[in-house]
């Protein structure tokens, strides 16, 4: 670390999609506070402009509550970290604007954080697994990745829509509402008949758009019970991801697997991964529910790791990056 033995204290801001969060964490892994507020659309899916309006509205309260719960002021933190991407442009701008304001007003360094990498780092911290293969699944992301030669390398990802988006869209179209994943899974557990649906794995990548289209068509045709369509959809979608994860373990020779991201709360996916990992004699870690979805603490902790190794950005250069990939980011705080 560039700052000796003292653990650095960083305030982190998350606003990439439907959640606005503020966390405070140290570079040694202490999570001091984690306060989040989630936008829930009244109808349909997430609308970026509405989500951004929500973030702007709740930001002062969330920030104030986080500081109060942690018992500190902005003056007492060493830096301000913010998720600059990937994510929805209007939402990202809310968090970036607040972070820039705090950095300038209180004279604090500004630390750019990749949202996806923050999911990986908070899961490393909370599971205690040092060098796993990650299955990162959320509404906006689906990838299998692991650390290699200074970066997180992608060993498989969706070629079109993310898994979470696939299930959320299906749920919305059939009237189950938002969030869709738990509601689809609830009906899937009542399914009795598996109906073959498109299973699309291309090399190490997956495709969910065709699966979604066929599942919706099947339901609308009236030829199958909704419970059976949900069961078939979940079974197919998750099995594709498990196949890619197993290939990544085989290719890298690693024995640890971590499930992270919002869909990490899925008991069905967890059980499928657990059986696969146990068959290989490996170890499965799962990020705790409070850190599975988007949250401010993961930005604060990852920001603290980055800042302790000299990462910072001038305010005038802190542009949002809606399509920022994990493999574009050098990871100076990891040697292996």
From Swiss-Prot:
Binding site for substrate: 136-140, 168, 185, 266
Entry GO CC: cytoplasm; EKC/KEOPS complex
Subcellular location: Cytoplasm
UniProt cofactor note: Binds 1 Fe(2+) ion per subunit.
Any Pfam family matching the protein: TsaD
Enzyme Commission (EC) number: 2.3.1.234
Keyword Signal: no
PANTHER family: TRNA N6-ADENOSINE THREONYLCARBAMOYLTRANSFERASE
Protein name per Swiss-Prot or TrEMBL: tRNA N6-adenosine threonylcarbamoyltransferase
Organism: Thermofilum pendens (strain DSM 2475 / Hrk 5)
Organismal lineage: Archaea, Thermoproteota, Thermoprotei, Thermofilales, Thermofilaceae
């Amino acid at each position: 670390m560039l700052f000796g033995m003292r653990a650095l204290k960083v305030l982190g801001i998350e606003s990439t999609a439907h959640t606005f969060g503020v966390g405070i964490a140290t570079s040694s892994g202490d999570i001091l506070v984690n306060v989040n507020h989630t936008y829930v659309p009244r109808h349909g899916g997430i609308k970026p402009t509405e989500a951004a309006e929500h973030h702007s509205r709740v930001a002062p309260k969330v920030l104030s509550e986080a500081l109060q719960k942690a018992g500190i002021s902005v003056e007492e933190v060493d830096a301000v970290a913010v998720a600059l991407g990937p994510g929805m442009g209007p939402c990202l701008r809310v968090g970036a604007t607040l972070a820039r304001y705090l950095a300038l007003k209180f004279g604090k360094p500004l630390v750019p954080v990749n949202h996806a990498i923050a999911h990986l780092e908070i899961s490393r911290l909370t599971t205690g697994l040092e060098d796993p293969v990650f299955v990162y699944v959320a509404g906006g992301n689906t990838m299998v990745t692991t650390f290699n030669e200074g970066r997180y390398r992608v060993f498989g990802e969706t070629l079109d829509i993310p898994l979470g988006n696939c299930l959320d869209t299906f749920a919305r179209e059939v009237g189950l509402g938002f969030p869709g994943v738990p509601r689809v899974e609830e009906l899937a557990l009542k399914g009795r008949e598996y109906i073959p649906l498109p299973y699309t794995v291309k090399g190490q990548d997956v495709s969910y758009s065709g699966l979604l289209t066929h599942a919706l068509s099947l339901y609308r045709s009236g030829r199958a019970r909704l419970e059976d369509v949900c069961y078939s959809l979940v079974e197919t979608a998750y099995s594709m991801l498990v196949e890619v994860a197993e290939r990544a373990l085989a290719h890298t020779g690693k024995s640890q697997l971590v499930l992270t991201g919002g869909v990490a709360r899925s008991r069905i996916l967890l059980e499928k991964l657990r059986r696969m990992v146990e068959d290989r004699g490996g170890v499965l870690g799962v990020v705790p529910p409070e850190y599975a979805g988007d949250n401010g603490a993961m930005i604060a902790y990852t920001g603290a790791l980055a800042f302790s190794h000299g990462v910072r950005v001038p305010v005038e250069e802190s542009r949002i990056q809606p399509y920022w990939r994990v493999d574009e980011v050098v990871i100076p705080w990891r040697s292996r």
